[in-house]
Amino acid sequence: GGEPQYTAEEYKDLQQFAMDCGMNPISEIDAPGHSLLFNRYVRNNIEEIRKVQGFENMPEDGIKSDRDWELLSVKGESGQWALKFLKALYSEYLNEADPVFLGDTVDIGVDEYWSIKNDEFDGMRNYIREMADTVQESGKKVRMWGSMKQYFDDKGISTKDYTDIEIDFWSNSWDNAAKRSAEGFKIVNVDSFHLYGNTGRDKRDVVNVEHIFNNWTPVTFSSSGTVQPADPNLLGAKTAMWADIADMGVTERDNYERLMRQAAVLSEKTWGGTDEDQTYEEYSLKF
């Protein structure tokens, strides 16, 4: 219930625990879409924000899109305030003296800026570049959710100045894995058609582990061209479990069961391959 959250110290402890177990945590600030929390924070704390140098004149709704509370603005004066606000947030969390984000890669999000308007595309592309530059100044690599088709391809804009950003490919309606690789982008396969689980929701509740074991490989992308097994730009694959909204009672144990099975089969197929003589039933006995 409520709004689960970590303090900065708790989040650092969680990352350090993962790193002690051999994992590299990738932290994400998913904006300018999915930004209701930031807009609400500014509205509720505007007087405190105005005490910060450089933010004395921020309007009450200074970073919000004028059409949706879920979106940060990417145009006009409010778009400039949004850039300034997010840059300040990244600078705080990537502070070299005491960083909150410990991994070597930071994800800037930028997916699902719903119903983007013609006068917002330039601002979106500028937002991507500005946030990437801000993260890179701290020595981190930058990643984003694959959205180049929407923001670049469909508008006839070249991506050549953005190939320093790694791409999490998640949807063929938002990006094209083969095209991005050919352009020089490093890509990660997290194709929603195969690898998404939406716990207790109206879409796929559980990743079809048996299907993944029998039919999937790291170069399997749904309707997005062909990526070759030896492609040096394919960094690997990952699975996703979106457990933030549930239409029915879901416990932490339910999520744990799903995540373990998803992660295990993805590891088997990505790192270990599959013994041609091993059946899914034999594999599943490991659990």
Residue ranges and their predicted role:
Residues 29-35, 112-114, 148-150, 171-173, ...:
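Active-site-proximal loop/turn and secondary-structure-junction residues that shape catalytic pockets
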Residues 60-166, 170-185:
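Active-site neighborhood of glycoside hydrolase catalytic domains
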Residues 36-43, 118, 155, 199-201:
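Short acidic, glycine/serine/threonine-rich loops at helix termini
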Residues 1-107, 130, 134, 243-245:
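Feature activates predominantly on carbohydrate-active enzymes
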Residues 5, 9, 76-80, 84, ...:
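Soluble non-cytosolic domains of exported or imported proteins
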